[in-house]
Regions:
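Nucleotide/pyrophosphate-binding catalytic subdomain
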Residues: 1-244, 249, 417-419, 438
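Structural motif
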Residues: 2-3, 31-34, 128-129, 162-165, ...
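Short, ordered loop/turn segments at secondary-structure junctions
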Residues: 37-40, 133-136, 169-170, 206-210, ...
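Internal glycine-rich alpha/beta core junctions
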Residues: 124, 262-264
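Surface-exposed amphipathic alpha-helical tracts and adjacent flexible/coil segments at the periphery
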Residues: 244-246, 255, 265-272, 346-349
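A conserved regulatory-domain signal marking ACT and ACT-like small-molecule sensing domains
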Residues: 270-439
Length: 439
């Protein structure tokens, strides 16, 4: 049995945190492959190393001196090395980084050095092999992740190492230049390594004890979810819930590898299990609540819309022509509403409206701005009557007007539209009725 373990930036921010990570890895001999992030914040006003690297490279790109900034980054890593009492010298690595910064090697290269250097320290600390992600994780000429090549090369390389560290966040282009995943991409690297290693479990260690039912910035001390399916997690991640990068779900989902989200600062907690399917009933009717602000709705009306073949396609074509993706499209007999990101839409709204008139000839178009979408997700909703009614009741009790409700055919989620100003109150009301009072 083997486990791939990924540790986030907060778990590796200092030597003290490194020691916790070392104890966790050594406590289970099945934790054979480690994916580290760059050092995060040591305290609330601290700066993440990735952000320090971005700022440092920005000066280099402008042809300005970046010595002080690079020295500060060196000091962060040296503090960790000294705290772990390692005989490790990164000076040659920093000479290469300085040279490449002066050669304007790009933001992707700059950002990736945080994980790269942390990986070297981690491998030295654990006595594991170090595998530079640029040699085993690949992107194609269009900058898209090359899953087939990566899996083949990485699987062969891991077979040569019983225990290894693979830095997160980056890989390489066909010409050898470094390319990063989107922010939070170390989660993706961990998933890719788990797939290539044919791991039994992918452990994702962070600073929370699992995936929470709701955003702790809105709900005080929300409960952790014990078990959640990939489909549920995908719905919640898409609607803004954070802990695991949404693209990290797919590689392990394909292989049926479960993910266990754990807390570095509380390793005794079981965390959250993310699985393909389960016979376990969720503790509550809902599994989680998530949402985003900043949407607007484009409401289109036309008599006899339901009998006009291709009407919806024509409307959506107007959005496509302007490079705007939609979030949800609830509809009635003579009405159709398209929800889009407001910041994406506002600069092109008149072009889109003109396009809808040209393509679909509607009777009326009305635009409403400053809306929020909330997803209530749970496999338990399918077998429970009255879930939507309870949501309406909770929101009505708080005098919140529901702008839209849309339930997927799978009955896995219900999407509610409310005003931006009602967003936090709405989430509190929904959490209260399903988790606290359970009315």
């Amino acid at each position: 049995m083997s486990k791939v373990v990924k540790f986030g930036g907060s778990s590796l921010a200092s030597a003290e945190q490194f020691k916790k990570v070392g104890n966790i890895i050594r406590a289970d001999k099945e934790r054979k492959y480690v994916v580290p992030s760059a050092p995060g914040k040591r305290f609330s006003d601290d700066t993440k190393v990735t952000d320090m690297l971005y700022a440092c490279y920005d000066l280099a790109d402008q042809g300005k001196s970046f010595k002080a900034e690079l020295d500060a980054i060196k000091a962060r890593y040296q503090e960790i090395i000294d705290g772990l009492q390692l005989e490790l010298d990164l000076s040659e690595e920093f000479k290469i980084i300085e040279k490449n910064f002066k050669a304007k090697s790009g933001n992707n290269y700059a950002a990736s050095r945080g994980e790269y250097l942390n990986g070297i320290i981690m491998a030295n600390y654990l006595g594991y092999d170090f595998i530079d992600a640029a040699t085993v994780i690949f992107f194609d000429e269009n900058g898209e992740f090359d899953a087939a090549k990566t899996n083949e090369v990485l699987r062969a390389r891991l077979a040569e190492s019983k225990e290894a560290v693979v830095p997160g966040f980056y890989g390489s282009m066909p010409d050898g230049t470094v390319k990063t995943f989107s922010r939070g991409g170390s989660d993706i690297t961990g998933s890719i390594v788990a797939k290539a290693a044919k791991a039994d479990v992918y452990e994702n260690w962070t600073d929370v004890s699992g995936f929470l039912i709701a955003d702790p910035r809105i709900i005080d001390h929300p409960e952790a979810i014990e078990t959640i399916t990939y489909r549920e997690l995908r719905e919640l991640a898409y609607m803004g819930a954070t802990v695991l990068h949404e693209d990290a779900i797919f590689p392990v989902r394909q292989e049926g590898i479960p993910i266990n989200i754990r807390n570095t600062n509380a390793p005794e907690d079981n965390g959250t299990w993310i699985v393909g399917s389960t016979c376990q009933k969720s503790k509550y009717v809902i599994t989680g609540i998530a949402g985003k602000k900043g949407f607007c709705s484009v409401n289109i009306e036309k008599d006899m819309m339901n009998s006009e073949i291709g009407f919806g396609r024509k409307v959506l074509q107007a959005f496509e022509e302007n490079g705007i993706s939609f979030e949800h499209v609830p509809s009635g007999i003579d009405t159709m509403t398209v929800f889009v990101h407001q910041d994406e839409f506002m600069h092109k709204e008149q072009k889109v409206v003109a396009g809808i008139h040209r393509l679909a000839n509607p009777d009326m178009i009305d635009i409403e701005s400053d809306l929020a979408l909330i997803a209530v997700v749970g496999r338990g909703m399918k077998s429970t009557r009255g879930t939507a009614g309870r949501i309406f009741s909770a929101l009505a009790h708080k005098n919140i007007n529901v702008k839209m409700i849309d339930q997927g055919s799978s009955e896995l989620n219900i999407i509610i539209g409310v005003a931006n100003d009602d967003f936090e109150t709405a989430i509190k009301a929904i959490y209260d009725i399903f988790v606290i009072t359970r009315l």
